[in-house]
């Protein structure tokens, strides 16, 4: 069949942003992200429109910050959070697919999986951070507390497929080695080959890390909503589980001396390590990237974090990885003609191709707005703009139609240096920080520096 067209199908998600740069492959990747997100947001955030079409919580969770840039997303996310709370188990566990059911209902043992079920807490926080509306936190606070206490309750427990961690009894009580989970998931095959044990065994490194991440988020949420005793409880849990994590990565089995980028990116992004461990992990991550030809070696959970981690070490490293066009990498997809985002890095070249319309890897677009162009909502009617030019880009720009109005940031390299252009919406202010210059306050209008 040929010669026919059909309109795209998606939920009602008004576009709220635009991004462009001198790198055409990155522009195509951004457009592909928008299309894949639209294809996968008909009433709920599905993983792909071509296979099981389930509401996978992990995909929704890692993409939420990007979705808040791309679309008017708050109402959609509030509805999905209600779905999560409706499906919450009596023990407090959020399910890993919402709504529950369908061909994958046999995977109920994966409920509570780190980075997936945590969506019930992380999505409300991301929506609050993007829009400043506390209602999603207030409406779901009790359910979020139940889930967090459920996760804390798994610490130190034994599971029938638990494997030894190498941590002694004093600190093993603060490590999560319980339940089935996905772990990092979908790392490149030459980094970490998939084994069936990935499904049936606990993943203590990933799960312990996410319990710290979870309890720290709940500490902030509890303080914001005035629940001081809850905040103290979650803060104390975060402190002791972080200590447990530091002992876990000091073992041979879970050592930071690894070429698996995810095992270094996660603790660096989540601030889980002590000072000596942090210094070592930073050096080891750069070494791991050297060994892998500065290609992307992270999996599902850590890919959205890696550019932030590299930018803290050296901004040039972040741009070097972003501009990589070889497989695995973000730009290898548009280079091969992709118009949507692939589930696996290999795309159609894989021996058994997976979905070719899977938006989750597009989560890196958050970095383009927030770091490359430097836009950040920083309170009611106020923004912070701190662009960080780099790499081989000659220009980059982004605009965001926020609930307060249109804000925009552009930079362009010229023979005389770098020119910056900023647009501030009516009745708003911006704290502008340009590289090498002190911060300055701007009122509504357009400015060029």
Could you tell me what each predicted segment is?
Residues 105-108, 134, 183-201, 252, ...:
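Short beta-alpha connecting loops at secondary-structure transitions
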Residues 43-45, 102, 247, 282-289:
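Flexible, solvent-exposed coil segments and beta strand-coil junctions
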Residues 236, 240, 316, 320-449:
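Non-catalytic C-terminal accessory modules of carbohydrate-active enzymes
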Residues 57-68, 74-80, 114-126, 204-219, ...:
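Well-ordered alpha-helical segments within folded domains of soluble proteins
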Residues 251-353:
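Extracellular polysaccharide-recognition and catalytic grooves
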Residues 105-129, 135, 139:
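Thiamine diphosphate
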Residues 93-106, 153-166, 246-257, 295-311, ...:
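Charged/polar, low-hydrophobicity segments characteristic of intrinsically disordered regions
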Residues 2-32, 38, 45-97, 130-207, ...:
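Active-site acid/base region of carbohydrate-active enzymes
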């Amino acid at each position: 069949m040929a010669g026919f067209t059909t309109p795209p199908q998606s939920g009602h998600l008004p576009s709220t942003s635009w991004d462009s740069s001198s790198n055409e492959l990155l522009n195509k990747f951004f457009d592909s992200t928008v299309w894949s997100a639209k294809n996968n947001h008909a009433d709920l955030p599905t993983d792909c429109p071509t296979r099981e079409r389930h509401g996978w919580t992990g995909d929704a969770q890692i993409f939420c910050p990007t979705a808040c840039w791309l679309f008017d997303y708050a109402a959609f996310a509030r509805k999905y959070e209600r779905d999560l709370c409706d499906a919450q188990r009596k023990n407090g566990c959020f399910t890993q697919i919402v709504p529950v059911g369908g061909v994958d209902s046999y995977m109920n043992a994966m409920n509570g999986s780190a980075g997936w079920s945590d969506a019930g807490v992380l999505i409300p926080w991301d929506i609050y951070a993007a829009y400043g509306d506390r209602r999603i936190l207030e409406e779901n606070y009790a359910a979020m507390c139940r889930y967090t206490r459920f996760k804390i309750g798994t610490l130190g427990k034994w599971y029938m497929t638990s494997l030894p961690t190498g941590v002694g009894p004093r600190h093993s009580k603060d490590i999560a080695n319980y339940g089935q989970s996905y772990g990092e998931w979908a790392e490149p095959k030459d980094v970490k080959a998939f084994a069936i044990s990935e499904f049936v065994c606990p993943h203590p490194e990933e799960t312990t890390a996410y319990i710290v991440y979870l309890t720290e988020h709940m500490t902030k949420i509890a303080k914001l909503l005035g629940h001081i005793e809850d905040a103290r409880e979650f803060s104390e849990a975060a402190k002791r589980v972080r200590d447990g994590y530091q002992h876990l990565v000091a073992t041979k089995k879970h050592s930071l001396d690894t070429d698996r980028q995810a095992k270094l990116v996660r603790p660096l992004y989540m601030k889980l390590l002590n000072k000596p461990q942090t210094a070592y992990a930073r050096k080891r991550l750069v070494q791991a990237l050297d060994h892998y030809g500065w290609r992307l070696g992270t999996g599902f959970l850590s890919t959205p974090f890696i550019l932030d981690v590299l930018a803290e070490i050296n901004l040039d490293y972040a741009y070097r990885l972003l501009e990589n066009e070889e497989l695995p990498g973000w730009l290898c997809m548009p280079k091969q003609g992709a118009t949507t985002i692939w589930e696996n890095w290999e795309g159609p070249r894989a021996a058994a191709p997976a979905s070719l319309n899977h938006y989750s890897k597009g989560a890196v677009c958050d970095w383009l707005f927030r770091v490359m162009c430097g836009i950040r909502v920083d309170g009611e009617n106020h923004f912070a703009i701190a662009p960080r030019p780099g790499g081989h880009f000659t220009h980059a720009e982004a605009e965001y139609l926020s609930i307060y109005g249109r804000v925009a940031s552009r930079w362009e390299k010229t023979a005389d240096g770098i020119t910056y252009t900023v647009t501030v919406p009516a009745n708003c202010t911006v704290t502008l920080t340009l590289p090498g210059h002190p911060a300055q306050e701007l009122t509504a209008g357009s400015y060029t520096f």
